[in-house]
Protein backbone atom coordinates (compact mmCIF):
# COMPACT_ATOMS: atom_id res chain seq x y z
CA UNK A 1 0.00 0.00 0.00
CA UNK A 2 1.06 3.52 -0.74
CA UNK A 3 3.37 5.10 -3.28
CA UNK A 4 6.81 3.66 -3.91
CA UNK A 5 9.34 6.21 -5.18
CA UNK A 6 11.56 3.42 -6.58
CA UNK A 7 8.81 2.06 -8.85
CA UNK A 8 9.76 4.07 -11.99
CA UNK A 9 13.38 2.90 -11.64
CA UNK A 10 12.23 -0.71 -11.30
CA UNK A 11 10.11 -0.44 -14.44
CA UNK A 12 13.11 0.90 -16.39
CA UNK A 13 15.38 -1.92 -15.17
CA UNK A 14 12.76 -4.54 -16.11
CA UNK A 15 12.22 -2.96 -19.55
CA UNK A 16 15.96 -2.94 -20.28
CA UNK A 17 16.43 -6.53 -19.15
CA UNK A 18 13.36 -7.68 -21.11
CA UNK A 19 14.86 -6.15 -24.27
CA UNK A 20 18.11 -8.06 -23.69
CA UNK A 21 17.02 -11.32 -22.04
CA UNK A 22 13.36 -11.71 -22.98
CA UNK A 23 10.21 -11.59 -20.89
CA UNK A 24 10.51 -15.15 -19.50
CA UNK A 25 13.95 -14.51 -17.99
CA UNK A 26 14.18 -14.77 -14.19
CA UNK A 27 16.43 -12.03 -12.88
CA UNK A 28 18.03 -12.40 -9.46
CA UNK A 29 18.96 -8.71 -9.71
CA UNK A 30 15.34 -7.58 -10.07
CA UNK A 31 14.29 -9.92 -7.24
CA UNK A 32 17.00 -8.48 -4.99
CA UNK A 33 16.09 -4.88 -5.88
CA UNK A 34 12.38 -5.59 -5.38
CA UNK A 35 12.64 -7.21 -1.98
CA UNK A 36 15.81 -5.71 -0.55
CA UNK A 37 15.24 -4.20 2.83
CA UNK A 38 12.06 -6.16 3.54
CA UNK A 39 13.88 -8.31 6.10
CA UNK A 40 16.01 -5.52 7.56
CA UNK A 41 13.91 -5.10 10.74
CA UNK A 42 13.88 -8.80 11.51
CA UNK A 43 16.51 -11.09 12.99
CA UNK A 44 18.47 -12.93 10.27
CA UNK A 45 17.95 -16.19 12.16
CA UNK A 46 14.21 -15.97 11.34
CA UNK A 47 14.92 -16.75 7.66
CA UNK A 48 15.10 -14.92 4.33
CA UNK A 49 11.31 -14.56 4.15
CA UNK A 50 10.73 -13.48 7.75
CA UNK A 51 9.03 -10.34 6.42
CA UNK A 52 6.06 -12.51 5.39
CA UNK A 53 4.96 -13.79 8.82
CA UNK A 54 5.95 -14.27 12.45
CA UNK A 55 5.05 -17.97 12.11
CA UNK A 56 8.56 -19.45 12.02
CA UNK A 57 7.53 -22.85 10.68
CA UNK A 58 5.80 -21.21 7.71
CA UNK A 59 8.85 -19.05 6.99
CA UNK A 60 11.08 -22.14 7.10
CA UNK A 61 8.72 -23.95 4.72
CA UNK A 62 8.67 -20.96 2.38
CA UNK A 63 12.45 -20.63 2.43
CA UNK A 64 13.00 -24.30 1.54
CA UNK A 65 10.22 -24.89 -1.01
CA UNK A 66 11.07 -24.00 -4.62
CA UNK A 67 7.33 -23.73 -5.40
CA UNK A 68 6.98 -20.77 -3.03
CA UNK A 69 10.50 -19.35 -3.00
CA UNK A 70 10.98 -18.57 -6.67
CA UNK A 71 11.91 -15.62 -8.84
CA UNK A 72 9.23 -14.02 -11.02
CA UNK A 73 9.83 -13.75 -14.75
CA UNK A 74 10.53 -10.28 -16.10
CA UNK A 75 7.00 -10.32 -17.55
CA UNK A 76 5.70 -11.04 -14.05
CA UNK A 77 7.65 -8.14 -12.57
CA UNK A 78 6.48 -5.89 -15.39
CA UNK A 79 2.85 -6.76 -14.65
CA UNK A 80 3.35 -6.34 -10.90
CA UNK A 81 5.02 -2.94 -11.29
CA UNK A 82 2.37 -1.78 -13.77
CA UNK A 83 -0.43 -2.78 -11.38
CA UNK A 84 1.29 -1.08 -8.44
CA UNK A 85 1.70 2.10 -10.46
CA UNK A 86 -1.96 2.13 -11.46
CA UNK A 87 -3.29 1.28 -7.99
CA UNK A 88 -1.24 4.00 -6.38
CA UNK A 89 -1.86 6.70 -8.98
CA UNK A 90 -4.06 9.67 -8.12
CA UNK A 91 -6.62 8.72 -10.80
CA UNK A 92 -7.23 5.33 -9.18
CA UNK A 93 -8.88 6.91 -6.15
CA UNK A 94 -11.32 8.98 -8.20
CA UNK A 95 -12.26 5.93 -10.29
CA UNK A 96 -12.86 3.68 -7.28
CA UNK A 97 -16.58 2.82 -6.80
CA UNK A 98 -17.89 5.11 -4.03
CA UNK A 99 -20.57 2.63 -2.89
CA UNK A 100 -18.33 -0.44 -2.70
CA UNK A 101 -17.88 -1.47 0.95
CA UNK A 102 -14.13 -1.69 1.48
CA UNK A 103 -11.87 -2.86 4.25
CA UNK A 104 -8.11 -2.47 4.24
CA UNK A 105 -6.22 -4.90 6.46
CA UNK A 106 -2.52 -4.84 7.22
CA UNK A 107 0.10 -5.66 9.77
CA UNK A 108 2.06 -2.91 11.46
CA UNK A 109 5.27 -4.85 10.70
CA UNK A 110 4.55 -5.33 6.98
CA UNK A 111 7.36 -3.72 4.98
CA UNK A 112 5.30 -3.83 1.76
CA UNK A 113 2.74 -1.51 3.35
CA UNK A 114 5.55 0.63 4.81
CA UNK A 115 4.75 -0.62 8.31
CA UNK A 116 1.19 0.70 8.20
CA UNK A 117 1.94 4.11 6.68
CA UNK A 118 1.22 3.05 3.09
CA UNK A 119 -2.07 1.42 4.06
CA UNK A 120 -3.15 4.58 5.91
CA UNK A 121 -2.17 6.58 2.80
CA UNK A 122 -4.49 4.39 0.70
CA UNK A 123 -7.24 4.72 3.33
CA UNK A 124 -6.89 8.52 3.32
CA UNK A 125 -6.96 8.61 -0.50
CA UNK A 126 -10.13 6.51 -0.64
CA UNK A 127 -11.72 8.57 2.11
CA UNK A 128 -10.95 11.84 0.33
CA UNK A 129 -12.35 10.33 -2.88
CA UNK A 130 -15.67 9.83 -1.08
CA UNK A 131 -15.81 6.07 -0.54
CA UNK A 132 -18.83 5.72 1.75
CA UNK A 133 -18.26 2.45 3.61
CA UNK A 134 -14.54 2.33 4.39
CA UNK A 135 -12.83 0.49 7.23
CA UNK A 136 -9.26 -0.26 8.23
CA UNK A 137 -7.91 -2.98 10.53
CA UNK A 138 -4.27 -2.82 11.56
CA UNK A 139 -2.80 -5.82 13.36
CA UNK A 140 -0.04 -4.93 15.80
CA UNK A 141 3.20 -6.78 15.04
CA UNK A 142 1.73 -8.70 12.11
CA UNK A 143 3.67 -8.90 8.87
CA UNK A 144 2.71 -9.23 5.19
CA UNK A 145 0.70 -12.47 4.98
CA UNK A 146 -2.06 -11.89 7.52
CA UNK A 147 -3.78 -15.19 6.75
CA UNK A 148 -0.53 -17.00 7.59
CA UNK A 149 0.17 -14.99 10.73
CA UNK A 150 0.32 -16.21 14.30
CA UNK A 151 -2.98 -14.40 14.93
CA UNK A 152 -4.66 -15.67 11.74
CA UNK A 153 -7.73 -16.92 13.66
CA UNK A 154 -8.34 -13.33 14.82
CA UNK A 155 -7.85 -12.01 11.28
CA UNK A 156 -10.27 -14.58 9.82
CA UNK A 157 -12.83 -13.88 12.57
CA UNK A 158 -12.64 -10.13 12.00
CA UNK A 159 -12.97 -10.56 8.23
CA UNK A 160 -16.00 -12.84 8.66
CA UNK A 161 -17.58 -10.34 11.07
CA UNK A 162 -16.96 -7.51 8.60
CA UNK A 163 -18.41 -9.51 5.69
CA UNK A 164 -21.48 -10.47 7.73
CA UNK A 165 -21.94 -6.82 8.67
CA UNK A 166 -21.73 -5.74 5.05
CA UNK A 167 -23.72 -8.59 3.51
CA UNK A 168 -26.01 -9.08 6.51
Spans of features found by a protein language model:
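Short, proline-enriched alpha-helix->beta-strand connector loops that line the catalytic pocket
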Residues: 96-102, 129-132
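Active-site nucleophile elbow and catalytic-triad environment of alpha/beta-hydrolase enzymes
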Residues: 68, 73-94
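Conserved alpha/beta-hydrolase "acid-adjacent" motif
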Residues: 111-121
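Short beta-strand/loop motif that positions the catalytic acidic residue
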Residues: 104-106
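Alpha/beta-hydrolase-fold enzymes
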Residues: 1-67
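Catalytic active-site module of serine/aspartate enzymes centered on a nucleophile-bearing elbow/loop
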Residues: 129-168
Amino acid sequence: GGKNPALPFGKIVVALLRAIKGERYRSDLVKKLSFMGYNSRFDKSEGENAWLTRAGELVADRDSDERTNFTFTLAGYNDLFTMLGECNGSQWYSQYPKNLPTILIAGTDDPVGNFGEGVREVYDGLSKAGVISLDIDMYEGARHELFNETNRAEVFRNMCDWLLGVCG
